[in-house]
Amino acid sequence: MSKLKIDTKRRFSLLIALVLIISLSSCATTQTNVTAITTKTVFNQETTYHNLLKLKKWQANGFIGIIYDNQAESANYTYLQDGDNFSIKLYGPLGIGSIEIKGDTNSVSLANSKGQKLTAKDAKTLMLEQLGWYVPVEGLKYWIKAIAIPNIRQTSELNTNNLLSKLSQNGWSISYSNYQLVDSKYPLPTKIRMSRDNLTLKIVIKSWQI
């Protein structure tokens, strides 16, 4: 009887170890290589812009702070973009449970942790109705990469690395800091501040997956 117990324990331990190895291997394959950008690195602005413009699919994870109408909220987020399709999951200290905003060029939906789902033609209308604030998703797929929306008027400033430090477009004032090189090719920011009217978004990007 004791031998059977020992064998069972050994098998269970081996199974747990195998699961951990598989999990760690899976995580390793999804993590994108990230390196620091030194102050001496100077990027070619045109090449960088076109490389980032071609980047159509990614996942960004981090933290967002929202200040609006003298109120402040915060949440963790997972933001996925695949061409024109996007998904933004907000969870944590938001105060309303977790929510997910999904959409494309035709429609947008918002689902909460209670199983309720609402749809609208655009994310701004839906988020203002349900949250009182909004994320400019139409521009975000460009701005989160620190590039301007193509063919729309904008003003910008560059830092010593020849990367965007400030951008004004579509009524938004955006500032960038703490860049890192992702996948050995893409200089991407880790801190973004976006302001328009009485709304300010502070976005911290903890990890990129490309």
UniProtKB/Swiss-Prot annotation:
Membrane topology: Lipid-anchor
Subunit structure: Monomer.
Signal peptide positions (record): 1-26
Subcellular localization, as worded in the UniProt entry: Cell outer membrane
Pfam families, alphabetized: LolB
Lipidated sites in chain (N-palmitoyl cysteine): 27
Protein source organism: Francisella tularensis subsp. holarctica (strain FTNF002-00 / FTA)
Protein name according to UniProt: Outer-membrane lipoprotein LolB
Keyword Manganese applies: no
Name of the gene encoding the protein in the UniProt record: lolB
Classification via PROSITE patterns: PROKAR_LIPOPROTEIN (PS51257)
Lipidation positions, renumbered (S-diacylglycerol cysteine): 27
Function: Plays a critical role in the incorporation of lipoproteins in the outer membrane after they are released by the LolA protein.
Gene3D superfamilies with a match to the protein in the record: Lipoprotein localisation LolA/LolB/LppX
Keywords: Cell outer membrane, Chaperone, Lipoprotein, Membrane, Palmitate, Protein transport, Signal, Transport
GO terms, biological process: lipoprotein localization to outer membrane; protein transport
Family: Belongs to the LolB family.
GO cellular component: cell outer membrane
